[in-house]
């Protein structure tokens, strides 16, 4: 997993509350357990005017030009600004996969659904919680200022606006450590590879009848 330390990124405002995981990545695209291939279908039912299907050539599909990610001023956005209860609905790890593959490194919202929140950290996507008043102000500034960027400093736990205003956010110390060091569950396990190998060796020696060579 790629480490997250600091990030300067263009902000895309998704001004909708209670965005659920089926809206983030619709169910028909969940047939793969690979982590790649979901970005082109992020928010599929909002980005396109037709019904998308797996492995379809999206370049030939009609775009919904009223949707924020189809607006030229937000092309290349890497920070998603959202409303409360983002990521609600069914549990699917494909949701943070799709957001990350599209190009988002962080999300800013007043609140998240618990499962989505946890899945985001496990996949290197930083979900930042800010007060609703601060989020409201960010929406106003983003919509009024083309090219609006934020600076996110995970070590300092701050979001800095273009006007220099600094917003602080809280994050669990363990999750922060994992993101700063690029550690997912597999990476954490591999840190104890020597201890695991030592245990397996002792276990095999003490109870050889449990193993078949």
Swiss-Prot record:
EC top class, in one word? lyase
Catalytic activity, EC: 4.2.1.33
What are the entry keywords? Amino-acid biosynthesis, Branched-chain amino acid biosynthesis, Leucine biosynthesis, Lyase
Which Gene3D superfamilies is this protein grouped with?
Aconitase, domain 4
Which positions form S-S bridges?
none
Q: Which CDD domains match?
A: IPMI_Swivel
Q: Name one GO molecular function term.
A: 3-isopropylmalate dehydratase activity
**What pathway is this protein said to act in by its record?**
Amino-acid biosynthesis; L-leucine biosynthesis; L-leucine from 3-methyl-2-oxobutanoate: step 2/4
Which reaction equation describes what this protein catalyses?
(2R,3S)-3-isopropylmalate = (2S)-2-isopropylmalate
Pfam families recorded: Aconitase_C
InterPro entries documented for this protein: 3-IsopropMal_deHydase_ssu, Aconitase/3IPM_dehydase_swvl, AconitaseA/IPMdHydase_ssu_swvl, IPMI_Swivel, LeuD
GO cellular component terms listed in the entry, alphabetical order = 3-isopropylmalate dehydratase complex
Q: Which GO terms describe its biological process?
A: L-leucine biosynthetic process
Similarity annotation: Belongs to the LeuD family. LeuD type 1 subfamily.
- Quote the function comment for this protein: Catalyzes the isomerization between 2-isopropylmalate and 3-isopropylmalate, via the formation of 2-isopropylmaleate.
Subunit:
Heterodimer of LeuC and LeuD.
What is the designated name of this protein? 3-isopropylmalate dehydratase small subunit
The protein's organism comes out as: Pseudomonas syringae pv. tomato (strain ATCC BAA-871 / DC3000)
Primary gene name: leuD
